[in-house]
């Protein structure tokens, strides 16, 4: 490891990563070395507001001391034993999760993509064993422009050509419908071989697309009418991001299955969870699904503490309190911008859509960085604004100034 001493500048570190790592990402040119709360710091110790939050993984803020201590304390005792044995941590975590979210059972996995893959299997099995769909005929409805990961099942469910190009053949029997379109959904639900509808309460990777208030009550009603599982992918929208513990709580509905991930560990460890009641979850029998790392003692301890921080520090309430004024303030200050098409969001899951014929969002992200705020674009026209939920009003006001200043720079240089 003597070569580490040769790495001095940000460019050295970037060149090192590009030389020895696969080129499956195109990072913003900043080399981060530490984080605390809403801030991250590069190797030259420049400070930035983090407005990506690792795609909403650090809702609790970077390196939260309580979560970190829970992680260290458990790591000193037992990190993994596999599900071949019971542990003294997993059952505690499972009980905490099911009580908190109001479901009978939880299945612990590691990543959001694994949660989605688990849901595909769970829903298909329920379809065959409970709904009595003919063998190998089960179908799952998803929405256009959804995003649930980059595993083969997830890209099979996707409509993103970049995710699918040269990765076929794909998993069959995913039906695609427009988002926020109950008429199109009902048309597909009439197929008796449909077992599930999997949907994001807000479409994040599509550009933070917020549905109409009537959409999810309509979804719940239609799924019940046609005996189809309503599955909410809350991996990004859940755990306070939109101002509620679950985004579906805004709409007064309870999905049959909930998918969670990202902030389930506060950014300290990969943890995901699938929640459902017994009539759904118990179709899975021993040996039919699992993961070596899923539900390990270290993950269980971290998960419980991350959720306690979310609840005890009232981070959901903070996102709810700050989100709407932040959004309204941005809309008001950017209403005359020549490069902004729309400002939208829910809670602290926000975005600005730019006119990509006038401005390049990559350049906007670079200017944000220069001005002390880092985030990332969604495709070629939208920039996410998703700070940790521990952000204060004063900090958010300062960030609003940075955002407006950055947009004004591009307005003035058209």
Curated annotation (Swiss-Prot):
It comes from the Eukaryota. Coiled coil: none annotated. It catalyses: a 2-oxocarboxylate + L-ornithine = L-glutamate 5-semialdehyde + an L-alpha-amino acid; L-ornithine + 2-oxoglutarate = L-glutamate 5-semialdehyde + L-glutamate. The keyword Cell cycle does not apply. It is found in: Cytoplasm. Pathway: Amino-acid biosynthesis; L-proline biosynthesis; L-glutamate 5-semialdehyde from L-ornithine: step 1/1. Its EC number is 2.6.1.13. Keywords: Aminotransferase, Cytoplasm, Disulfide bond, Pyridoxal phosphate, Transferase. Unlike for mammalian OATs, activity is increased by TRX1-mediated reduction of the disulfide bond between Cys-154 and Cys-163. Binding to TRX1 may also induce conformational changes that facilitate substrate binding. Homodimer. This is Ornithine aminotransferase. It comes from Plasmodium falciparum (isolate 3D7).
């Amino acid at each position: 490891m003597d070569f580490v001493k040769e790495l001095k500048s940000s460019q050295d570190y970037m060149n090192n990563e590009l030389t020895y790592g696969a080129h499956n990402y195109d990072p913003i040119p900043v080399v981060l070395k530490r984080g605390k709360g809403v801030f991250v710091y590069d190797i030259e110790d420049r400070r930035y507001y983090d407005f990506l939050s690792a795609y909403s993984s650090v809702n609790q803020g970077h390196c939260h001391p309580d979560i970190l201590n829970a992680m260290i304390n458990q790591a000193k005792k037992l990190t993994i034993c596999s599900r071949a044995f019971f542990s003294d941590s997993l059952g505690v975590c499972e009980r905490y999760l099911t009580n908190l979210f109001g479901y009978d059972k939880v299945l612990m996995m590691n990543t959001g993509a694994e949660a989605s893959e688990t849901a595909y299997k769970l829903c298909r099995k329920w379809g065959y064993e409970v709904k009595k769909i003919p063998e190998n005929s089960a179908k799952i409805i998803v929405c256009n422009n959804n995003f649930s990961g980059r595993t083969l099942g997830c890209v099979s469910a996707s409509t993103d050509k970049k995710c699918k190009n040269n990765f076929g053949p794909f998993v069959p029997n995913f039906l695609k419908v427009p988002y926020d379109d109950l008429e199109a959904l009902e048309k597909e639900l009439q197929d008796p071989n449909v077992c599930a509808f999997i949907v994001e309460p807000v479409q994040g990777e599509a550009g933070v697309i917020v549905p109409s208030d009537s959409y999810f009550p309509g979804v719940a009603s239609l799924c019940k009418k046609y005996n189809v599982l309503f599955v909410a992918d809350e991996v990004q929208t859940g755990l306070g991001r939109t101002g509620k513990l679950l985004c579906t709580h805004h709409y007064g509905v309870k999905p049959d299955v909930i998918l969670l991930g990202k902030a389930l560990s506060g950014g300290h460890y990969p943890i995901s969870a699938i929640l459902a009641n017994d009539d759904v979850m118990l179709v899975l029998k021993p040996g039919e699904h699992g993961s070596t790392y899923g539900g390990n003692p270290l993950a269980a301890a971290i998960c419980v503490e991350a959720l306690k921080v979310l609840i005890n520090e009232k981070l959901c309430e903070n996102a709810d309190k700050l989100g709407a004024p932040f959004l309204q303030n941005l809309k008001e200050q950017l209403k005359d911008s020549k490069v902004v098409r729309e400002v939208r969001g829910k809670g602290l899951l926000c975005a600005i859509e730019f006119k990509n014929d006038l401005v390049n969002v990559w350049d906007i992200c670079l200017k944000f960085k220069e001005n002390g705020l880092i985030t990332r674009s969604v495709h070629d026209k939208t920039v996410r604004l998703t700070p940790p939920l521990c952000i204060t009003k004063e900090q958010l006001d300062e960030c609003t100034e940075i955002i407006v200043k950055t947009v004004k720079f591009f307005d003035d240089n058209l």
